[in-house]
């Protein structure tokens, strides 16, 4: 079996940061085997291709002269930064216009992908793009092509591209995975006969076990955790294996971002994702489904591992901007991480998700600022106590207001998530 494996990240998810999941799997598989994994970011390629075409006047979007000027300024703002990036009023105006333009184009293409997948109606640009993407994924002759899906909008493009991959190379194995795939019922994914496997929840161990089983020529895959596979001998036509505990942070290598072009992401400087824990430390919010992406209870890496990963990224890629993508991090862990960053003199800035608990004292938030925190996205959800209690958030409106005031005093900008409806 060919040792080359590719993992595709397909449109549509606006590329503001580098993909994390495929980078974790690449590092894990390559450290524990002799397979070679290439992460292919078709998503970033698509957005850059559209923006470049629009700037050159070659897109189907018809701009007025003023709209074209604004689009040009917005693209430059996201790509190069400059004074306009720090002018809040102008940033908001340009980013809203840029986003609305992008959304229009996404919707046109999404409709084309859905018509192709559901009805076999091919709009020429959709067919041409899917064939182009498939040929790119097959250029290095892989034996396995994986598709990493975080969002619903990536599903139809991934399905159509996978169809063309299989049509061009029938013996290639197609594997779907990622957060969105984990939330789908297997019958939805396996309605597409060219998809061979689904890896659900955390994919590192299961994906590597699958590659090794295929390499041995196995036709049954009963013992592989976190895997759904086709079996013609059972009524549903597929078998869902039990999930296994997550790979221990102690044995998991740092993510490998070497396949990505850092200038392809719409930020003046690349923002690297950091996952310091898996699952949620609170894990009680009644509306939340994020637990479906994980295997088992909350697990956190120790502070040395987290700061070591940040230091590795700084030294390897020369980056200074980071995003913690944990579901939430406790104030105590934030404090320890920040203190270690300060002690080591690691000069970075970062943002993170957080739950507005009163245990975010002024002292903790001040230390977080000194350690590089500049922006916190708070899960406030509601200012109504009855609604908060029904959500099991464990907060109060007055407590939230106090935490936000403390954060502002520390110099950290606040972003509030509110559920309306």
Tell me the role of every PLM-derived stretch.
Residues 38-127:
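Conserved N-terminal ligand/cofactor-binding loop architecture of enzyme catalytic domains
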Residues 3-4, 12-49, 102-242:
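Glycine-rich beta-alpha loop elements in corrinoid/cobalamin-binding modules
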Residues 41-43, 292, 418:
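Residue-level recognition of beta-strand->loop/alpha-helix junctions
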Residues 93-133, 144, 269-290, 294-297:
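Active-site cores of enzymes that catalyze phosphoryl transfer or operate on phosphate-rich substrates
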Residues 250-415:
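Radical SAM [4Fe-4S] cluster-binding motif and immediate context
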Residues 5, 37, 174, 224-225, ...:
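Hydrophobic/aromatic residues located in beta-strands of well-ordered beta-sheets
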Residues 9-12, 147-151, 324-327, 354, ...:
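Short glycine-centered, acidic/aromatic-flanked micro-motifs in structured strand/loop junctions
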């Amino acid at each position: 079996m060919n040792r080359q494996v590719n993992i595709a990240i397909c449109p549509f998810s606006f590329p503001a940061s580098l993909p994390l999941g495929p980078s974790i799997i690449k590092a894990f598989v390559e450290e524990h085997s002799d397979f070679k994994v290439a992460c292919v970011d078709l998503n970033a390629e698509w957005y850059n291709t559209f923006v470049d075409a629009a700037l050159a006047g070659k897109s189907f979007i018809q701009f007025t002269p003023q709209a074209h000027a604004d689009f040009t300024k917005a693209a430059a703002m996201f790509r190069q930064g400059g004074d306009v990036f720090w002018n809040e009023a102008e940033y908001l105006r340009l980013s809203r216009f840029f986003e609305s333009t992008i959304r229009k184009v996404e919707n046109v293409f999404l409709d084309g992908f859905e018509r192709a997948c559901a009805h076999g109606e091919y709009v020429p640009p959709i067919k041409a793009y899917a064939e182009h993407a498939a040929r790119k994924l097959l250029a290095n002759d892989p034996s396995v092509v994986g598709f990493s899906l975080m969002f619903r909008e990536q599903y139809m493009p991934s399905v159509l591209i996978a169809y063309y991959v299989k049509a061009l190379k029938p013996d290639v194995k197609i594997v779907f995975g990622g957060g969105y795939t984990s939330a789908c019922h297997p019958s939805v994914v396996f309605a597409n006969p060219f998809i061979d496997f689904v890896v659900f929840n955390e994919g590192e161990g299961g994906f590597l076990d699958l590659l090794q089983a295929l390499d041995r020529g196995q036709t049954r895959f009963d013992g592989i955790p976190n895997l759904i596979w086709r079996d013609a001998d059972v009524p549903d036509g597929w078998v869902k294996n039990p999930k296994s505990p997550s790979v221990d942070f102690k044995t998991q290598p740092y993510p490998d971002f070497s396949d990505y072009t850092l200038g392809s992401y719409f930020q003046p400087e690349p923002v690297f994702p950091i996952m310091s824990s898996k699952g949620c430390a609170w894990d009680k919010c009644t509306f939340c489904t994020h637990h479906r992406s994980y295997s088992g209870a909350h697990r956190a890496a120790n502070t040395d591992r987290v700061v070591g990963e940040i230091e590795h990224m700084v030294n390897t890629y020369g980056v200074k901007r980071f995003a913690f993508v944990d579901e939430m991090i406790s104030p105590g862990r934030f404090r320890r991480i920040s203190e270690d960053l300060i002690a080591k003199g690691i000069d970075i800035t970062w943002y993170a998700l957080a739950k507005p608990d009163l245990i975010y004292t002024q002292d903790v938030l001040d230390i977080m600022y000194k350690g590089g925190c500049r922006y916190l996205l708070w899960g406030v959800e509601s200012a109504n106590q009855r609604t908060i209690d029904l959500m099991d958030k464990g907060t109060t409106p007055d407590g939230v207001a106090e935490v936000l005031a403390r954060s502002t005093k520390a110099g950290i900008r606040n972003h509030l998530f509110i559920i309306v409806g």
